[in-house]
Design a protein with these regions (language model features):
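Non-heme Fe(II)-dependent double-stranded beta-helix
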Residues: 1-17, 23-123, 129, 170, ...
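A short secondary-structure junction signal
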Residues: 115, 119-123, 133-134, 151-157, ...
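Extracellular structured ligand-interaction cores
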Residues: 19, 105, 136-140, 152, ...
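Short, structured patches in soluble enzyme cores that scaffold and shape functional sites
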Residues: 107, 125-127, 143-147, 159
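Double-stranded beta-helix
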Residues: 148-211, 235, 246-249
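Non-heme Fe(II)/2-oxoglutarate
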Residues: 36, 44, 48-54, 61, ...
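A short beta-loop-beta micro-motif enriched in histidine and acidic residues
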Residues: 97, 126-138, 191, 198, ...
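Short, conserved beta-strand element in jelly-roll/cupin
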Residues: 131-150, 197-198, 205, 229-233
Length: 254
């Protein structure tokens, strides 16, 4: 029997540590369907006829780079169905203590095997890239579409970092992890890193203020995650102008 922690324990963990791991939400059939649908999108096959919001990897690009595509749910109904699944939404609402949740952005993050340094994502907070939200009430859910072990380059969380002040110099795009560790050490001499080693179909949730990163995938299989950014009824928008304003202009997409 698979142990399922009580909702109250998951709520407390998310609040105090900045992240939590849900039990298996999606069965193997659902994850396999979504996996194949995402691969179609990566290959430029759009079932709905609509392109994604943005592609950060094109066919013919370096296969060792992390493949990241924004809003793949627009391209394929199976992906749409995955991120709008009622049971999934109920879990997110329960754990975040929300009366209502809404997906406002999605990404596929496909980390190739043996990706080397190109598979590294630097330490960062999601909030530092989201000037259009206040920190409270905004979260990220990471759906594992492949088993994630220590060799896969799992997402790594710093326990309790959701309660820290901002640390200047940390950045998702900075692959020089050794230098980032120096910055972390100067700011916080004592901290604990937890790997999100979860099984296919499980989900990790983290706060917009939780520092996280990932190392290269040294395994023989891709590490595939469907990233779902969602807001709750207690999230507050901040008016912004320019390119960033488009992120929240199409909330009806999800």
């Amino acid at each position: 029997m698979i142990y399922k922690p009580p909702i109250k324990d998951l709520k407390q963990k998310l609040k105090s540590e900045g992240f939590c791991f849900l039990p298996n939400i999606f069965n193997s059939n659902r994850t396999n369907i979504a996996y194949n649908a995402l691969w179609d999108v990566i290959q430029g096959k759009y079932e709905t006829g609509k392109p994604p919001d943005a592609r950060f990897w094109e066919i013919g690009d370096d296969p060792n780079n992390i493949i990241k595509i924004d809003k793949p749910h627009l391209c394929n109904k199976k992906i749409w169905d995955l991120i709008t699944d009622n049971n999934f939404g109920q879990w997110l609402a329960n754990v975040t203590d929300a009366k209502r949740i809404q997906v406002w952005h999605s990404q596929v993050v496909w980390k190739p095997p043996c990706s080397g340094k190109k598979g590294i994502a630097g330490w960062h907070r999601d909030n530092q890239y989201w000037p259009f939200w206040t920190p409270e009430g905004v979260f990220t859910a990471w759906i594992a579409l492949s088993d994630v072990n220590p060799e896969s380059g799992p997402v790594r969380y710093i326990q309790g970092s959701n309660q820290w002040n901002n640390i200047a110099g940390l950045d998702f795009f900075d692959k020089n992890i050794s230098e980032q560790y120096k910055i972390l050490q100067d700011a916080q001499s004592d901290y604990k890193v937890i790997n999100a080693t979860i099984r296919k179909g499980q989900v990790s949730i983290h706060s917009s203020l939780t520092y996280h990163s990932s190392m290269q995938n040294t395994s023989q299989s891709p590490r595939v995650g469907m990233v779902v950014h969602f807001c709750t009824d207690y999230a507050k928008r901040i008016p912004v102008n320019g390119e960033l304003s488009r992120y929240l202009n199409c909330l009806e997409d999800t």
